[in-house]
Curated annotation (Swiss-Prot):
Gene giving rise to this polypeptide: hll
Domain of life: Eukaryota
Catalysed transformations (reactions): a long-chain fatty acid + ATP + CoA = a long-chain fatty acyl-CoA + AMP + diphosphate
Identification of the protein by name: Long-chain-fatty-acid--CoA ligase heimdall
Organism: Drosophila melanogaster
Family from the record: Belongs to the ATP-dependent AMP-binding enzyme family. Bubblegum subfamily.
Molecular function in Gene Ontology: ATP binding; long-chain fatty acid-CoA ligase activity
Miscellaneous section: In Norse mythology, Heimdall is the fictional character that for ages guarded the bridge to Asgard without sleeping and without the consequences of sleep deprivation.
Residues noted as binding ATP in the record, renumbered to the chain: 223-231, 414-419, 491, 506, 639
First-tier enzyme category under EC: ligase
Known role: Mediates activation of long-chain fatty acids for both synthesis of cellular lipids, and degradation via beta-oxidation. Probably by regulating lipid storage and catabolism, plays a role in neuronal function.
Keyword Hydrolase (UniProt): no
Length: 681
């Protein structure tokens, strides 16, 4: 058992101060998991599973058919070399190592190398601007930064003079500018990797490792706030190891040495850290790296190679898979489409029966068996035929999306967590309510704070996975984690009779109308999306207003490289319009706006939005869809009265979506303020 560093509080806002651990929690699981540092956890796993495959990545022209596989034993060797490399360029204890790169094996090597050297890991989204990168490195007191390529190195060149603690920048992949490996402080990963390090440096590494304690900070996760610069969430070694073991214990059907994962979501996000980096260590799972264009269309290629057994994705990832499947289905013959529709209905019916705790009839089982033979080739086509568990989280998942995949024998189990809880605190594994976030993981205590007459209130949680604090922000830390250990999530929810957590929305997103009605927007937004399959994004407006309105964007294709929305409509939008006897295939034709908005030009997008004159049939159909959604409103105050169309789909590239593909509500409000004001005149 790792000795703990003396601490006086359960909270900390400094990289140099440890925290007390809640080892006396009533959970029996918590008492069976001793505190452990991440290097100890890593070493234990690598030695236990030394001959099993750990990491796989594409290396065109080399390896086995263009792919390289690393065993856990080799993984451990690479991490030791990375730790020595970081020491050689001056990484300081209790400083951070910034990692500004797309998912790749070197990300993992740098992470565990930094931790072994007594440093803290601070991931940076590759999409961040130079100023946003500066914020992470300055806040995190970085002494070393690892960057992906020349494009990311250019950001560091622009800001390095303003980072006096930053001693070294290491570039992972070429091509390299002339200054790399020649100017002081700039290195290539390859050259450092080729070095042989002295026995003195190796002794220094062991000495540093021996000083690490489980109750010290191991990682900084920067929350993607909508107001101001992101806050740095401090996670301890114990936070991350405990959350990993808690999630693993909650999952079913784990087969040691036979699990396969695909790493494609940003590793600067806590969900990817737990699912990609740490879960594989807990039961010898093999991680295959997708390329940097995974979310722009190449992910299926990696799935076909890796055949993952467990998958985690934000809803937008599953929406992209759905789009591919819908487009492929549209090209099939009418008889094939009819057969597939009936098969999907039979599979969904069978799954729904099981979730309700009922036993299917003999006829139902036979129908399901036959239907599975029809949908299996589709699962094979997208590389998920071996996948037994599908998790989604990070944003609300629509009922329509869940039903679509349920028909393919894919039950999307929602999970719930935050950066501040070190990852997942609930997992919907043994699904009894498809529309819930499942039940609390082992060692987690949940409660609903000040519930209303429907049992709904703020979700609170406590346990060893509650974060240390926000770096340098004691007031914000005290607002979030109270002295009694309860973390106030800011999320609204309730617990159903079966113990499942149902998420209603965010307290901060709660709309309070001029009449004083409290309205969580997500539920209403999802109802409208269900009624209008042509719509990609819905944003409810109404705070301090007399009535509710919505901004809507229609589904269009996007540029595979830049992620910028295109003028061409998606196949499902075209089909929906065809039923209205509208035959346009481009958004500009449909809304009578310019075809090239020069995105991400906000000025042009706003001007086009203000001048939209859409087809009357389209406006009528949208109005009817909103009326259908309004039938489910629990009061007149929750009915949507007006809507406005936006001139392009929301995206990360144009700023309306954050890195985890959540709508950035404040930004959309500001960008389209003139459009919103027109809805209230």
């Amino acid at each position: 058992m790792n000795d703990l560093k003396p601490a006086t509080s359960y909270r900390s806002t400094s990289l140099h101060d440890a925290v007390k651990l809640r080892l006396d929690e009533p959970s029996s699981f918590s008492q069976t998991v001793p505190p452990q540092t991440i290097p100890e956890f890593f070493k234990e796993s690598c030695e236990k599973y030394s001959d099993l495959p750990a990491l796989v990545w594409e290396t065109p022209g080399s390896g086995n058919d263009g792919w390289t596989t690393l065993t856990f034993g080799e993984y451990q060797e690479r991490v030791e070399q990375a730790a020595l490399m970081l020491l050689s360029v001056g990484v300081e204890e209790r400083s951070s190592v910034g990692i500004l790169a797309f998912n790749c094996p070197e990300w993992f090597f740098a992470e565990f190398g930094a931790l072994r050297a007594g440093a803290v890991v601070a991931g940076v989204y590759p999409s961040n601007s130079a100023e946003a990168v500066h914020h992470v490195l300055a806040t995190g007191e970085s002494s070393v930064c690892v960057v992906d390529d020349a494009q990311q190195m250019a950001k560091l060149r622009a800001i390095k003079e303003r980072l006096p603690r930053l001693k070294a920048v290491i570039q992972l992949h070429g091509p390299f500018e002339a200054f790399v490996d020649h100017e002081p402080g700039y290195f290539s990963w390859q050259k450092l990797q080729e070095q042989t390090f002295s026995s003195e440096l190796k002794e220094e590494l062991l000495a540093r490792e021996s000083r690490i304690r489980a109750n010290e900070c191991a990682m900084l996760i920067f929350t993607s706030g909508t107001v101001g610069m992101p806050k740095a969430v401090m996670l301890s070694h114990d936070n991350l190891v405990f959350d990993t073991k808690s999630a693993a214990a909650h999952m079913q059907d784990i087969q040691v040495g036979k699990e396969s994962f695909v790493s494609y979501l940003p590793l600067s996000h806590v969900a990817a850290q737990i699912f990609d980096v740490f879960l594989g260590l807990s039961h010898a799972g093999c991680v295959t790296f997708a390329d940097k264009d995974a979310l722009k269309g190449t992910l299926i290629k990696t799935f076909r190679k890796a055949r993952p057994t467990k998958m985690f994705g934000v809803p937008r990832v599953f929406e992209k898979l759905q789009e591919r499947l819908v487009a492929a289905e549209a090209k099939a013959r009418p008889y094939s489409r009819l057969l597939l529709a009936r098969a999907r209905a039979a599979v969904a019916e069978h799954q729904t029966t099981l979730m309700a705790g009922k036993s299917p009839s003999i006829y139902g089982n036979a129908k399901y068996w036959l239907a599975c033979r029809v949908v299996k080739p589709i699962r094979e086509m997208i590389g998920v035929d071996n996948c037994r568990v599908f998790f989604t989280g990070g944003a609300p998942t629509s009922e329509e999306l869940k039903q679509f995949f349920l028909g393919l024998d894919i039950a999307l189990g929602e999970c719930y967590g935050m950066s501040e809880t070190s990852g997942a605190i609930t997992l919907n594994v043994d699904i009894s309510n498809l529309y819930s976030a499942g039940q609390a993981c082992e060692g987690v205590t949940l409660k609903i704070h000040e519930p209303d007459c429907n049992g709904q209130g703020e979700i609170l949680m406590r346990g060893r996975l509650v974060f240390m604090g926000y770096l340098g922000l004691p007031d914000k830390t005290e607002e979030t984690v109270k002295e009694d250990g309860w973390l106030h999530s800011g999320d609204l929810g309730y617990i159903d009779p079966k113990g499942n957590l149902i998420i209603s929305g965010r307290l901060k997103e709660l709309i309070i109308t001029a009449g004083g009605e409290n309205i969580p927007p997500v539920h209403i937004e999802e109802l409208i999306k269900k009624e209008l399959p042509c719509v990609s994004n819905v944003l409810l407006i109404g705070d301090h207003r007399k009535y509710l309105t919505v901004l809507l964007s229609l589904k269009t294709k996007c540029d595979a490289k830049t992620g910028i929305p295109l003028d061409a409509l998606r196949e499902e939008t075209i089909e929906w319009l065809r039923d209205l006897d509208i035959h346009e295939t481009r958004l500009s034709e449909l809304l009578n706006i310019p075809a090239d908005l020069q995105l991400p030009n906000d000025t042009a997008a706003l001007a086009a939005t203000l001048e939209i004159t859409a087809k009357p049939k389209l406006l009528e159909a949208i109005e009817e869809g909103i009326k259908r959604a309004n039938k489910y409103a629990i009061s007149n105050a929750q009915k949507v009265q007006k809507f406005a169309l936006i001139a392009h789909e929301f995206s990360v590239a144009t700023g309306e979506l954050g890195p985890t593909l959540k709508i950035r509500r404040n930004i959309v409000h500001a960008k389209y303020a003139k459009v919103i004001e027109r809805l209230y005149k």
